[in-house]
């Protein structure tokens, strides 16, 4: 498993980028199916419930809501899938989904990619290209918030890898 691969520095468009990865002992199609099972993300993303609100959840134009919080206290992250690609059978391209965060708190692009490393191994890459809220306050606060945000996402990725591996080995 790897640690955050970017320093949260501005991307060329002024967004803040955060990329985290985790290696999973399961084939790429298995990992892809698990990370894009939107309703199951609450199993591995702390205090988050995700639901599909439009479309099939596996194509451009589909919409999702993710509520992160405890009880009624939290925030709603609304998203639209803007890119969806899966490699053709026999090819080795990545599985990739890009969502546009359209909510009041989280804005920007989120990217999920699964890359095959071997027949029973893959790498899941989660990138956020964030438009920080609150203008200058958000830009000033990002270096303070980023380490905790990255640690939380990395914990979620490790849990996802464990759960995905367990499911895969139980079905073999």
Which role fits each region the language model picked out?
Residues 1-59:
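Hydrophobic ligand-binding cavity/cleft-lining segments
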Residues 4-8, 14-17, 64, 125-133:
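N-proximal short alpha-helices
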